């Protein structure tokens, strides 16, 4: 056997590989029977995709989003390359409907695709190829496109769109509500397995949000939408509260106080919802309580959440510090000193931060 290939053989091998890759791109991909929504928020300029399927790791291939450009869902007999191609066209300023026509022109197997697109101005388009498996179809409206294939029936898409229109709150909240409504209407008639949500939001100070403001995946689960809801609620306390405060600071620096206040308000509303649903995760409660207390908003709720977190994890000095801060900001220095003293004792006096906090509370500053 030769130890190496000749130059001529390498050229033939390279040509063969190129032909195989070209054929793979042109051919229908693995079927992704699924339902999805692509959507736009005119207030925050967020764009995103939420999706569920009886397919492992649907979030790997279906959702694409870029702030200032738009969002795309690629499904059915999926050609994954159409996702980034569509984003590039949207980024150039091409409206959603024109992007769809452009994709059809470059894909010889477009009849097997299902695609939803929303652009950064709220324009939307959906396409279901004649080779998509029944029931398959879509619906568009201002700022959204819903679509699905191998569904229980047309009510899946109709109810998904209706829930999105009627649900209030953040874009992610509205999109997850849309998935829940679609599943309630019958969903993917083969069942459930994975779900995902991807949202991008413009930011100059935090450029990472331009591609990933919210990104959550449930790869393999008996009830993936229910699990997506659960991890979304955790995500709000761990990450989203901080993101809202980042936007608030950026808007404040630009002199846009109304927008800064709106970002802080969203943190408070998230905390209120966590309390209302009986959230038990001490980390979630602590994150939201600290975000509110440190910004002097929703202070009674911050005290309540922090106390609930302490009850669940009574020797966690970080959580005790949050409770003390919330009491202090609420005007109860005596209680703040009592709680912070407990934190210092548990810590054994090692943390200078905790000791400084105690000094601050005693000084009334």
Residue locations for each model-derived region?
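Alpha/propeptide regions of enzymes that mature by internal proteolysis
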Residues: 32-190, 197, 219-251
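Start-of-helix register in tetratricopeptide repeats
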Residues: 242, 283, 318, 352-353
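"A position-specific structural signal for the A-helix of alpha-solenoid helical repeats
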Residues: 246, 287, 322, 329, ...
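Structural motif corresponding to the intra-repeat A-B loop/turn of tetratricopeptide repeats
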Residues: 254, 295-296, 330, 365
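Alpha-helical adaptor scaffolds
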Residues: 259, 276-325
């Amino acid at each position: 056997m030769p130890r190496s290939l000749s130059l001529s053989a390498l050229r033939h091998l390279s040509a063969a590989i190129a032909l195989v890759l070209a054929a793979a791109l042109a051919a229908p991909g693995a079927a992704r029977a699924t339902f999805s929504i692509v959507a736009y928020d005119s207030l925050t300029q967020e764009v995103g995709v939420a999706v569920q399927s009886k397919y492992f790791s649907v979030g790997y291939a279906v959702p694409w989003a870029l702030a200032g450009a738009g969002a795309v869902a690629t499904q059915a007999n999926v050609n994954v390359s159409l996702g980034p191609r569509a984003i590039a066209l949207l980024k150039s300023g091409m409206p959603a409907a024109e992007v769809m026509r452009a994709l059809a022109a470059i894909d010889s197997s477009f009849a097997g695709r299902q695609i939803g697109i929303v652009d950064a101005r709220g324009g939307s388009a959906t396409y279901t190829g004649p080779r998509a498996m029944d029931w398959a179809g879509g619906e568009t409206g201002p700022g959204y496109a819903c679509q699905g294939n191998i569904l229980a029936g047309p009510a899946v898409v109709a109810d998904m769109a209706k829930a999105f229109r009627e649900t209030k709150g953040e874009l992610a909240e509205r999109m997850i509500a849309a998935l829940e409504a679609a599943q309630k209407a019958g969903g993917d008639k083969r069942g459930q397995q994975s779900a995902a949500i991807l949202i991008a939001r413009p930011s100059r100070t935090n450029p990472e949000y331009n591609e990933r403001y919210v990104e959550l995946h449930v790869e393999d689960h008996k009830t993936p939408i229910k699990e997506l809801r659960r991890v979304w609620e955790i995500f709000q306390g761990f990450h989203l509260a901080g993101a809202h405060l980042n936007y608030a600071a950026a808007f404040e620096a630009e002199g846009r106080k109304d927008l800064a206040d709106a970002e802080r308000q969203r943190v408070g509303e998230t905390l209120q919802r966590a309390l209302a649903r009986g959230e038990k995760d001490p980390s979630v409660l602590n994150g939201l309580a600290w975000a509110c207390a440190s910004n002097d908003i929703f202070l009674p709720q911050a005290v309540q959440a922090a106390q609930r977190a302490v009850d669940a994890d009574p020797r966690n000095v970080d959580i005790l510090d949050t409770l003390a801060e919330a009491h202090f900001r609420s005007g109860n220095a005596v209680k703040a000193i009592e709680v912070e003293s407990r934190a210092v004792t548990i810590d054994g006096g090692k943390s200078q931060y905790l000791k400084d906090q105690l000094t601050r509370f005693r000084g009334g500053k």
